[in-house]
Amino acid sequence: IQLQPGQIADFARDAEPLYRRLAKSLSRGLLVTCDYGFETAALFDPRVRFHGTLACHRRHAVHRDPFRNIGTQDLAAHVDFGLLVRVGEEEGLRTLAFTRQAPWLLACQIGEELVLADDRTRRETAMLLDGEGMGETIRVLVQAREIDDQELFAPEFRELFAASRIAAVSPT
């Protein structure tokens, strides 16, 4: 990663060894990662994220000053999904999908579950599917060992996996 002079980048030092341990420990199954993040090049693109991705959350408000409300706010930074894809594949996992949360939940047929849900659950779920909010900004990475997507998933998943493989690890 080459940073520009003055550019700030968030780096999770323990992400690689942790993900490597998780991948090695999986003898058969899926490793599903859901979080805010991007593929490596997009994550560190100085034209978009010159000041990094650190965000401070307090009472449904977001700001960038980690020293403002010490001890009373959550701090978060975006995940380098390119790193996770690379590490998982180095450890023998097969990348089935890297997509946004909304298409993932729709492929999980969340709509069918909402038919019987109460109004509050429907409203909360709508936030997860919002194309300008969480449905757009949260990514889902699915990697597998000894699992054939044909054996495990409904046709909706197979379509999603095929589309995300074509897009490699850069969902648009």
Give the residues covered by each predicted segment.
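Long, Lys/Arg- and hydrophobic-enriched amphipathic alpha-helices
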Residues: 1-172
